[in-house]
């Protein structure tokens, strides 16, 4: 496969969320969630530059992640769900950026061992889906574009990996357009964006000024 003329890496904001209230009750969840987040980041393709918002468990941490995403001018945000969490831990991170938010609803275990599953095991390995509806509803209300990728870690899930890579490629295309110069031959006067070619639409959607 031929390599592109320009190797452009998309800037992708990545963070995970969990509910702070769980952690004092079940301190073993902290290393569990940290390990899951680190493992997830390693599955992301090398065609992107990860802007790491970290593991978020409070609205203040969410706001800090949002500051990083805005400063980096990200092309996409990927959110890993670790367990149930309120949407207030998510929305501050994406409130002031106009890019799609991809929610990764990927459960660690394929199925519970019911005889051995206690509360921290359930919350830490089997409850990634707990707040998906709440997150999507809140993003819709905030006017944010979003998508959900659902699957499982145990045993591998090629469909999940393919979907994530598709989103990263789309983000890469967006970044390339933003860094591209397009020549236009023949125009009445520079800056008159309403004639011949719809320059207004090009600029609005692709940040391209011809």
Locate the predicted segments by residue.
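An N-terminal assembly and electron-transfer interface module characteristic of large anaerobic redox
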Residues: 1-210
């Amino acid at each position: 496969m031929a390599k592109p003329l320009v190797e452009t890496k998309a800037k992708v904001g990545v963070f995970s969320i969990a509910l702070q209230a769980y952690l004092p009750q079940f301190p073993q969840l902290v290393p569990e969630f940290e390990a899951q987040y680190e493992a997830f980041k390693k599955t992301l393709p090398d065609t992107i530059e990860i802007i790491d918002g970290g593991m978020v468990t409070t609205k203040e941490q969410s706001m800090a992640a949002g500051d990083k995403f805005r400063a980096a001018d990200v092309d996409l945000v990927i959110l890993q769900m670790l367990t149930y969490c309120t949407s207030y831990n998510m929305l501050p991170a994406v409130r002031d950026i106009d890019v799609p938010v991809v929610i990764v609803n990927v459960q660690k275990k394929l199925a519970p061992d019911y005889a051995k599953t206690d509360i921290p095991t359930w919350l830490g390995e089997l409850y990634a889906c707990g707040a998906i509806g709440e997150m999507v509803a809140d993003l819709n209300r905030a006017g944010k574009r979003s998508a959900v990728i659902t699957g499982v870690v145990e045993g591998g899930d090629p469909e999940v990996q393919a979907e994530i890579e598709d989103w990263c490629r789309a983000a890469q295309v967006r970044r390339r357009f933003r860094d591209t110069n397009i020549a236009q031959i023949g125009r009445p006067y520079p800056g008159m964006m309403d004639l011949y070619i719809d320059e207004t639409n090009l600029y609005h959607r692709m940040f391209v000024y011809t």
